[in-house]
A protein has these predicted regions:
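Metabolite-binding pocket within alpha/beta catalytic cores that recognizes anionic/polar moieties
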Residues: 1-72
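Glycine-rich beta-alpha junction loops
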Residues: 17, 95-102, 140, 159-161
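Active-site rim beta-loop-alpha module in soluble metabolic enzymes
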Residues: 53-126
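Polyanion-binding loop/helix "lid" in catalytic or ligand-binding cores
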Residues: 71-76, 131-138
């Protein structure tokens, strides 16, 4: 192992679907927290990075099934949040699903374990903290970064809004706009 460890700034720039009707497609979401729904972080010693109060509120609100991995909520880097927030960013908790189909509430021919789970996630609000969007990376990035001593932030180009049933007409453009926004914020 290295003797002198270096703290990195890790910025995820990706796409996601908005879960709230007031977050339009083609907008940007800055993730204040990552919500690990898949249990990946349970492989590590996570007591120092958990947010037990919010996690317990989420579990109670959703009536989380006991056979699923216990949700974990991890905060972003407040330093990076201050650097990247602006009047064009929406902020909130980003749910991180462990897959594309059932884990995100998509129904094919198989019934979901909890057909109301997406609605419960959308309706969660703990002291103003609500789940704004859904994707598959943020909680792992936040959790591993915190455990390894790095700073992390997730920025999301909203290409769909589940609450409104709307989709970006030009998702490539919103992704490009977010990349430029991110680079400009890095450059200062």
């Amino acid at each position: 192992p290295k003797e002198n460890l270096k703290s990195l700034d890790i910025i995820r720039v990706g796409t996601s679907g908005a879960l709230q009707n007031d977050i339009p497609v083609d907008s940007f979401v800055l993730s204040t927290h990552g919500l690990d729904l898949n249990g990946m972080l349970h492989s590590y010693q996570i007591d120092s990075i958990k947010n037990t109060e919010v996690e317990e509120a989420f579990i109670a609100h959703t009536n989380w099934h006991q056979n699923k991995a216990k949700p974990i909520i991890i905060k972003n880097s407040k330093t990076l949040e201050k650097q990247f927030e602006s009047e064009v960013t929406y902020k909130g908790l980003t749910a991180t699903a462990g897959g594309f189909y059932g884990p995100q509430g998509r129904v094919l021919r198989l019934a979901l374990q909890d057909s109301e789970l997406n609605h419960k996630i959308d309706a969660f609000n703990h002291n103003g903290l609500r789940v704004t969007n859904l994707e598959m990376e943020t909680s792992a990035i936040y959790g591993l970064s915190k455990l390894l001593g790095h700073n992390a932030l997730s920025l999301n180009a909203v290409i769909a809004n589940r609450a409104n049933g709307t989709f970006s007409k030009n998702p490539g453009q919103v992704v490009e706009s977010l990349i430029k926004y991110t680079l400009n914020k890095i450059a200062g």
